[in-house]
Amino acid sequence: MADTNNKLKSGLGKITQIIGAVLDIKFAEGKLPEIYEAIKIKKNDGDTLVVEVAQHLGDDTVRCIAMGPTDGLVRGMDAEGTGAPISVPVGENTLGRMFNVLGNPIDEKEAPKNVEYYPIHRKAPAFEEQSTQTEILETGIKVVDLLCPYQKGGKIGLFGGAGVGKTVLIQELITNIATEHGGYSVFTGVGERTREGNDLYYEMIDSGVINKTTMVFGQMNEPPGARMRVGLTGLTMAEYFRDKSGKDVLLFIDNIFRFTQAGSEVSALLGRMPSAVGYQPTLQTEMGALQERITSTKNGSITSVQAVYVPADDLTDPAPATTFAHLDATTVLSRSIVELGIYPAVDPLESTSRMLDPRVVGEEHYKVARDVQEILQRYKELQDIIAILGMDELSEDDKLLVARARKIQRFLSQPFHVAEQFTGLPGRYVPVAETIQGFKEIIEGKHDDIPESYFLNAGNIDDVLARVKANK
């Protein structure tokens, strides 16, 4: 050991152990790097691997999490402390660009010029800096604006199993916010499919939305360290737009479950005792550190939309359950609605929002939303009777209610701009006032004579009436 110690220079270390994505590095006495410091390791193939200090083990050794593949590393390799955490570029020049967890461009273009660099580990805004305004963010998506309206500067969770349309809904939100509100968006791909990220990038170029968006990716083929930290990289870029540019920013995280999953993988390698269902014991702390930075201040706001994969459709799993605690609104996507061919497959009875309050949205909006939910709930209760005895056994009032419920169910669907190439239907942005008007008319029975098929994939109520007229 004495021989190794002689080789250790100031700020230089030697790799002593490699366990998958976690490695131990021994430094000279008194030259230990701090927790969260970035350390660079030059590989034999010329690439530089960045690792982040996670633990001090004693005996001048630190345990680090790799942000890239560890293949090609051997014990005894040199490692150099940088004296700072991982820092990433921020500012207007990052718009239209695509980065990895370290802030390096991955769109085959040069690194952005004239940018500041922020460390990815930062404190949440102080208590007195935070703003508590209640203002609705209009999305142009009927089911969202009516039943689970989003708060400007709030946190929204998109819950759903595999393949129910979370990513498509996120893409539509990015399109609508950029075209209708002119706001900046930061899209953070955490542990999802590279193909989807690639599709999203080219779709955004085609629609012209890319110039208002910064994209950060740590996809599912990358080591757990990158997937665990890429959320912080995207958040740091969004914080700059909020604090320095004074903008209202949309931060998309697809998928927040993968952040937890990566933490779980790393936690086991770091030697921590697993807790419930094998998750890391620090699950609440890690989630809190990320979520508390997503907030509105006096300068601007960050509205965050987070896709939440629900393992085996089990909402009581610790990962989605921990996420729930931080959210202002939940948009639940349901497989049973996908099976009906209704998109977006938002469950109108499971989705909730703290904003659905007459003091925030107004009496009319609140009443229409509650009436819609009441009719759909009653229809749900009647479905067992219909399945056993058939429609004929229902009372006249119930028959009318079922007919209206089926129209409402279909009218909650909507063609999306980002899905035009698949559906062949032009996308529709529906203002809140038109949404309320349409559902109010259905509830009042003004369209009882129109067949329910006309309501499927329509924009506002005028689109439905135009279809009826065209087919006469």
From Swiss-Prot:
PROSITE patterns the record matches: ATPASE_ALPHA_BETA
Membrane topology: Peripheral membrane protein
Uppermost EC category: translocase
SUPFAM superfamilies linked: C-terminal domain of alpha and beta subunits of F1 ATP synthase, N-terminal domain of alpha and beta subunits of F1 ATP synthase, P-loop containing nucleoside triphosphate hydrolases
CDD domains registered for this protein in UniProt: ATP-synt_F1_beta_C (cd18110), ATP-synt_F1_beta_N (cd18115), F1-ATPase_beta_CD (cd01133)
Localization (cell): Cell membrane
Keywords (A to Z) from UniProt: ATP synthesis, ATP-binding, Cell membrane, CF(1), Hydrogen ion transport, Ion transport, Membrane, Nucleotide-binding, Translocase, Transport
GO MF term (any one): ATP hydrolysis activity
GO cellular component, as recorded: plasma membrane; proton-transporting ATP synthase complex
InterPro entries: AAA+_ATPase, ATP-synt_VA_C, ATP_synth_F1_bsu, ATPase_a/bsu_AS, ATPase_alpha/beta_chains, ATPase_F1/V1/A1_a/bsu_N, ATPase_F1/V1/A1_a/bsu_N_sf, ATPase_F1/V1/A1_a/bsu_nucl-bd
Disulfide bonds: none
Binding positions (ATP): G160, G161, A162, G163, V164, G165, K166, T167
EC numbers on record: 7.1.2.2
Catalytic activity entry: ATP + H2O + 4 H(+)(in) = ADP + phosphate + 5 H(+)(out)
Family: Belongs to the ATPase alpha/beta chains family.
Quaternary structure (record): F-type ATPases have 2 components, CF(1) - the catalytic core - and CF(0) - the membrane proton channel. CF(1) has five subunits: alpha(3), beta(3), gamma(1), delta(1), epsilon(1). CF(0) has three main subunits: a(1), b(2) and c(9-12). The alpha and beta chains form an alternating ring which encloses part of the gamma chain. CF(1) is attached to CF(0) by a central stalk formed by the gamma and epsilon chains, while a peripheral stalk is formed by the delta and b chains.
Function: Produces ATP from ADP in the presence of a proton gradient across the membrane. The catalytic sites are hosted primarily by the beta subunits.
HAMAP family: ATP_synth_beta_bact
NCBIfam families referenced in this protein's UniProt entry, alphabetically: atpD
Protein's name in the database: ATP synthase subunit beta
Organism: Lachnoclostridium phytofermentans (strain ATCC 700394 / DSM 18823 / ISDg) (Clostridium phytofermentans)
Species lineage: Bacteria, Bacillati, Bacillota, Clostridia, Lachnospirales
